[in-house]
Curated annotation (Swiss-Prot):
NDH-1 shuttles electrons from NADH, via FMN and iron-sulfur (Fe-S) centers, to quinones in the respiratory chain. Couples the redox reaction to proton translocation (for every two electrons transferred, four hydrogen ions are translocated across the cytoplasmic membrane), and thus conserves the redox energy in a proton gradient. Binds 1 [4Fe-4S] cluster. This is NADH-quinone oxidoreductase subunit B. Its main location: membrane. InterPro entries: NADH_UbQ_OxRdtase-like_20kDa, NADH_UQ_OxRdtase_20Kd_su. PROSITE patterns: COMPLEX1_20K. The gene is nuoB. Keywords: 4Fe-4S, Cell inner membrane, Cell membrane, Iron, Iron-sulfur, Membrane, Metal-binding, NAD, Quinone, Translocase, Transport, Ubiquinone. [4Fe-4S] cluster binds at C37, C38, C102, C132. Belongs to the complex I 20 kDa subunit family. Its cofactor is [4Fe-4S] cluster.
Length: 160
């Protein structure tokens, strides 16, 4: 958190935007939407070697309790409405991480008739994590990029 000034009396001053965004970056609660082999790497990122808890990332079982969706794997046409329904059940503000080549653009199965060529056709994506499958380090880097994106957003509406 960038602090504009520290007074001698023990007060810290900052903008409300920076305070709210700082708290949001430290408490990301993703809902896993693991569809294929990328989900295994997502599980590795939550295990003890990488430990996403130190970033404030705690996996939640319900979309109503989460603010981040990690789409990991091949999205087929039959699963696309379910993805959209789960996304709509998430509370605002919400973010989406597209993990892996299949979620990003169809991947190896791009020309199949039953595969959606990127989950960004169904839900708005904030961060793309490349790879087939991407490593746990790549997912952690994607989460850090999402935290940087959240820090740059304006949360309080300004009068024009």
């Amino acid at each position: 958190m960038a602090i504009e000034g520290v007074l001698n009396e023990g007060f810290v001053t900052t903008t409300a935007d920076k305070l709210i965004n700082w708290t949001r970056t430290g408490s990301l609660w993703p809902m896993t939407f693991g569809l294929a082999c990328c989900a295994v790497e997502m599980m590795h990122a939550g295990a003890s070697r990488y430990d996403l808890d130190r970033f404030g990332v705690v996996f939640r079982p319900s979309p109503r309790q989460s603010d981040v969706m990690i789409v990991a794997g091949t999205l087929c046409n039959k699963m696309a409405p379910a993805l959209r329904k789960v996304y709509d059940q998430m509370a605002e503000p919400r973010w989406v991480i597209s993990m892996g080549s299949c979620a990003n653009g169809g991947g190896y199965y791009h020309y199949s008739y039953s595969v959606v060529r990127g989950c960004d056709r169904i839900v708005p994506v904030d961060v793309y994590v490349p790879g087939c499958p991407p490593t746990a380090e790549a997912l952690i880097y994607g989460i850090i990029q999402l935290q940087a994106k959240i820090r740059r957003t304006n949360t309080i509406a300004r009068k024009a």
